[in-house]
Amino acid sequence: MLSITILFLLIAEGSSQNYTGNPVICLGHHAVSNGTMVKTLTDDQVEVVTAQELVESQHLPELCPSPLRLVDGQTCDIVNGALGSPGCDHLNGAEWDVFIERPTAVDTCYPFDVPDYQSLRSILANNGKFEFIAEEFQWNTVKQNGKSGACKRANVNDFFNRLNWLTKSDGDAYPLQNLTKVNNGDYARLYIWGVHHPSTDTEQTNLYKNNPGRVTVSTKTSQTSVVPNIGSRPWVRGQSGRISFYWTIVEPGDLIVFNTIGNLIAPRGHYKLNSQKKSTILNTAVPIGSCVSKCHTDRGSISTTKPFQNISRISIRDCPKYVKQGSLKLATGMRNIPEKATRGLFGAIAGFIENGWQGLIDGWYGFRHQNAEGTGTAADLKSTQAAIDQINGKLNRLIEKTNEKYHQIEKEFEQVEGRIQDLEKYVEDTKIDLWSYNAEFLVALENQHTIDVTDSEMNKLFERVRRQLRENAEDKGNGCFEIFHQCDNNCIESIRNGTYDHDIYRDEAINNRFQIQGVKLTQGYKDIILWISFSISCFLLVALLLAFILWACQNGNIRCQICI
């Protein structure tokens, strides 16, 4: 009966709605049931309340024609467009920020090669416009406007419309041609010219009379002299001959001299070069849509504010930096310690050392209290704002560091320059590896600092409360203080807002701290009483059993015989 009575009292005390103990105030921080894992300098898996993904992995399945001007080469690459190949007439006068070359582009005229193809391609792409200026060239005693069956325009034999194929005259003459053009303008001129390589000696003399022919093009600072390479080659569009195209830039005040005795594919004018233009070229099969984006890749456009992307290493204009990582998360909240399902026996509240608080939704840091008036929770906005300001500043600085305009184009080399191509790819791979490592390190460093900052703000808040309460309360070691004086909700609020005056309550707190109180059912006393109750119950049970045996023996109901 005694043990049952004691257990009943314990249960009744635990289920009571009225709190009769000393007031308690606890400090805590926000928590969520499922946080986000981030990497720091010291740990690969740290759970935080919130984090921001820094790597963009989504792209649009199209190229955006705004705000950048895109020109679709369609079946023409940029060099064929500059030469004026049939099927490229839509590029006449075209202007672009990004010239889109298609993998399906084909040559549609006389078979040709460009010995320095990539340089010419780059010059044309960077220029951003096909601004062709026609000029008058006085060629003497030669036939002009040669045509070829390999170069059909509207099913009629034609030729590159920016070039003039010179052949011998009807009088079987091809005298020495020597022509000079002076650049009196204020811009650089790009001249594209060519040399025809016949397939046989007969073709050479039939076209130019002179065998061998020769073409020499000179400026004040350069000279290129080419002797035709006569010989049979594989047939392409019905032709075994070839044309080699060259290019010469003539600066303002310079001049260009054409000297030939045959085989010259002469220019009809020049392209105006714009040194201020920063256009480029992109080789991709992705269609042009109607979206808006400043970043283009060979896989589509990217629309994002994130500083990194792992979509493509080939990117144009205002693009995030390419990194190998699929994810880099920047902590934007504090360390997450999910709240336990139960907080000790009989609903005891706990502070930040044990866990976070999932109910603290209007701030990062806050208070919980328990007194005679009940329990309550309130956020501390000052410490919350201090942490947010520091984290926001870190986020802005990180984006500023990494959000430089990044432009990485695909570089190609002729097969003869294979070693250079391998070296270039090695350098690019090394740069990407280095930047990927730097990005990961930078994010880990910022995450470490973020967690340290938020932990520091929690400790600052705890120290502020401890200095206010001083000897009026006892630190319970779990982020809570037990207050040794009566503290109603107004008193609790003064602790929260920093206006608490410990001198007002000092005498009461000291008296209560040393006063001999009645038995207090703390966790330790409850255990002792339970053990005492259990022992007494066992003793009473044994005593009752012995008394029954003695009574039965006296009445003869039980006989006890002892044999020796």
Curated annotation (Swiss-Prot):
Topology relative to the membrane: Single-pass type I membrane protein
Listed GO MF terms: host cell surface receptor binding
GO biological process: clathrin-dependent endocytosis of virus by host cell; fusion of virus membrane with host endosome membrane; fusion of virus membrane with host plasma membrane; viral budding from plasma membrane; virion attachment to host cell
Source superkingdom: Viruses
Record site feature (Cleavage), residues: 343-344
Signal peptide as annotated in the record: 1-16
SUPFAM superfamilies per the UniProt record, alphabetical: Influenza hemagglutinin (stalk) (SSF58064), Viral protein domain (SSF49818)
UniProt main location, coarse: virion
TM regions (residue ranges): 528-548
Topological domain spans for side Extracellular: 17-527
Keywords, alphabetical: Clathrin- and caveolin-independent endocytosis of virus by host, Clathrin-mediated endocytosis of virus by host, Disulfide bond, Fusion of virus membrane with host endosomal membrane, Fusion of virus membrane with host membrane, Glycoprotein, Hemagglutinin, Host cell membrane, Host membrane, Host-virus interaction, Lipoprotein, Membrane, Palmitate, Signal, Transmembrane, Transmembrane helix, Viral attachment to host cell, Viral envelope protein, Viral penetration into host cytoplasm, Virion, Virus endocytosis by host, Virus entry into host cell
Residue pairs linked by disulfide bridges in the UniProt entry: 26-480, 64-291, 76-88, 109-151, 295-319, 487-491
UniProt cross-references to InterPro entries, sorted A to Z: Capsid_hemagglutn, Hemagglutn_HA1_a/b_dom_sf, Hemagglutn_influenz_A, Hemagglutn_influenz_A/B
Role summary: Binds to sialic acid-containing receptors on the cell surface, bringing about the attachment of the virus particle to the cell. This attachment induces virion internalization of about two third of the virus particles through clathrin-dependent endocytosis and about one third through a clathrin- and caveolin-independent pathway. Plays a major role in the determination of host range restriction and virulence. Class I viral fusion protein.
Family: Belongs to the influenza viruses hemagglutinin family.
Something else known: Major glycoprotein, comprises over 80% of the envelope proteins present in virus particle. The extent of infection into host organism is determined by HA. Influenza viruses bud from the apical surface of polarized epithelial cells (e.g. bronchial epithelial cells) into lumen of lungs and are therefore usually pneumotropic. The reason is that HA is cleaved by tryptase clara which is restricted to lungs. However, HAs of H5 and H7 pantropic avian viruses subtypes can be cleaved by furin and subtilisin-type enzymes, allowing the virus to grow in other organs than lungs.
Protein name: Hemagglutinin
Organism for this UniProt entry: Influenza A virus (strain A/Duck/Alberta/28/1976 H4N6)
